[in-house]
């Protein structure tokens, strides 16, 4: 779609730093959205306004404008280069659908096009974007055109640690319910604070899911927020087990350790999941489940059995601070190098 001279002028204006006392000009040119001026980052191709501080890419901004039936912005974003077909995933009135057609949209989207739009829209990991994705795709009949297995593959890939090592999603037959958990998990994985609070306030029945995701994705900040402030609790040994699911989860493992979780059991769990860095971290904290770990492995796993067979390990001599303050934990473990891992790596095995 060829842009008009007026839309090009607006695009240039949106890229300028307009003083507050001249914001009335932006209102006159319809460069106003969610109680604030629209700005356009020409380098990143991001649309921003008061309610979308992190920004949305042009296609995603179009999806939002279509969902809100904001005709002026639909036309503007389309002229600025947004793909008008993206608007078809969020269209909710015939008038808006007609407008999209006038601007060049197809009659309908096929399965591959819908799936590609879904993949594209969820790419940017910001609070604004994840909340919008949830609002657009929740109970959206357009997803009925997409093969259920293909959709689940897209979702499961980013949640593979939880899928492979827990049964938390095994009985989630509803795609809408699965998508809700997916968006919530992504918010926690990338520590999107506004999105986390949005889901927490709106879906209190998923409190345990929030705690689980914080543990699995090593988000010690949200773990502390959920556990201490919001009083979302579960058995401490189960918390440690979930923290051990994914390797390098030192922060959430340490949080559970300070709360009183059994460090020998954590070592066993790490061994069973073949998470070597987690295992060495447990040794640093005083775990000594070498014999039990070897037995738990069964056949195979030669490397880890060799590690466990050596009598060269001992607890770290420099103790970590006994605190559940996430700032302290994050600072202490940001560049952590396991003492026992270094002992093994420098040990002469000949």
UniProtKB/Swiss-Prot annotation:
GO terms for biological process: taxis. InterPro entries: ASFV_MGF360 (IPR002595). ANK repeats lie at residues 57-89. Pfam families: ASFV_360. Keywords: ANK repeat. Belongs to the asfivirus MGF 360 family. Plays a role in virus cell tropism, and may be required for efficient virus replication in macrophages. This is Protein MGF 360-12L. It comes from African swine fever virus (isolate Warthog/Namibia/Wart80/1980).
